């Protein structure tokens, strides 16, 4: 599909969003992939796309889908900036495919967000973008670990100090070239890449930790879907005040 980033001939950095959405979400025990499960009358992916579409600073929003995805084209058109490309076997493959899709007219920065995190707030995303651009460094939304963490298998073997532990959230925001090069090289080396930050860390580049709201949950299990419904209603009530 042809598209063109719109930088309006200004000095503002161009930003593209990437949503890896090629997974099947087997833990949801549902016929459709989890991003197409309904939450308060809309699919999870619709909620996520609607949230990102509220960000005027995004030039394009790339959704990486399974090649045989039959659901996406059935969704209502939310924003003309949304385009699709083919995802890969793993999340990192989908993100790299999206980066290569953008290569003909690359943005300055990319914002990668989980399809199954529809509860992220606009305020958190703007804080992430502004702090990273101001520092000229990539970063991620993250939440300080509050629970006691144990290491073990069947039995607890060790309590892990949590003073410097953070739970990585999304979006994750990095310079386009930094992330593309880091992912390409890390995957070629056989490194296990679980999120974009892990690729940047592998490349020995800094990753800023930007505190984000703990209700920015990833919907992975049926229990998460119930919790997301409650949290969505709570957010809507907050916004109505």
Swiss-Prot record:
Key words, A-Z: Isoprene biosynthesis, Nucleotidyltransferase, Transferase
Protein task: Catalyzes the formation of 4-diphosphocytidyl-2-C-methyl-D-erythritol from CTP and 2-C-methyl-D-erythritol 4-phosphate (MEP).
InterPro entries for the chain: IspD, IspD/TarI, IspD/TarI_cytidylyltransf_bact, ISPD_synthase_CS, Nucleotide-diphossugar_trans
Family the entry assigns: Belongs to the IspD/TarI cytidylyltransferase family. IspD subfamily.
PROSITE patterns xrefs: ISPD
Biological processes per GO annotation: isopentenyl diphosphate biosynthetic process, methylerythritol 4-phosphate pathway
Protein name: 2-C-methyl-D-erythritol 4-phosphate cytidylyltransferase
EC assignment: 2.7.7.60
Site (Positions MEP for the nucleophilic attack): 162, 218
Catalytic activity entry: 2-C-methyl-D-erythritol 4-phosphate + CTP + H(+) = 4-CDP-2-C-methyl-D-erythritol + diphosphate
Pathway(s) the chain acts in: Isoprenoid biosynthesis; isopentenyl diphosphate biosynthesis via DXP pathway; isopentenyl diphosphate from 1-deoxy-D-xylulose 5-phosphate: step 2/6
Site, Transition state stabilizer: residue positions: 27, 34
CDD domains, A to Z: CDP-ME_synthetase
Entry's Gene Ontology molecular function annotations: 2-C-methyl-D-erythritol 4-phosphate cytidylyltransferase activity
């Amino acid at each position: 599909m042809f598209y063109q980033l719109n930088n309006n001939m200004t000095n503002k950095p161009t930003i593209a969003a990437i949503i890896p959405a090629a997974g099947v979400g087997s833990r949801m025990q549902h016929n459709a992939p989890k991003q197409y499960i309904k939450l308060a009358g809309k699919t999870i992916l619709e909620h996520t796309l609607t949230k990102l579409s509220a960000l005027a600073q995004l030039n394009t929003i790339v959704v990486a889908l399974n090649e045989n995805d039959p659901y996406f084209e059935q969704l209502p058109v939310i924003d003309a900036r949304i385009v699709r490309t083919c995802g890969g076997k793993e999340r990192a493959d989908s993100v790299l495919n999206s980066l290569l899709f953008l290569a003909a007219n690359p943005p300055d920065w990319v914002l990668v967000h989980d399809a199954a995190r529809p509860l992220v707030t606009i305020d958190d995303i703007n804080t992430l973008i502004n702090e990273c651009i101001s520092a000229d460094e990539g970063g991620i939304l993250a939440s300080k670990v509050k629970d006691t963490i144990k290491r073990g298998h069947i039995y607890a073997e060790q309590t892990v100090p949590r003073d410097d532990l953070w739970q990585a959230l999304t979006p994750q925001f990095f310079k386009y070239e930094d992330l593309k090069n880091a992912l390409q090289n890390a995957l070629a080396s056989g490194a296990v890449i679980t999120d974009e930050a892990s690729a940047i860390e592998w490349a020995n580049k800094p990753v800023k930790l930007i505190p984000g709201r703990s209700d920015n949950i990833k919907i992975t299990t049926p229990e998460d879907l119930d919790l997301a419904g409650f949290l969505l209603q709570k957010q809507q009530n907050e916004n109505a005040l």
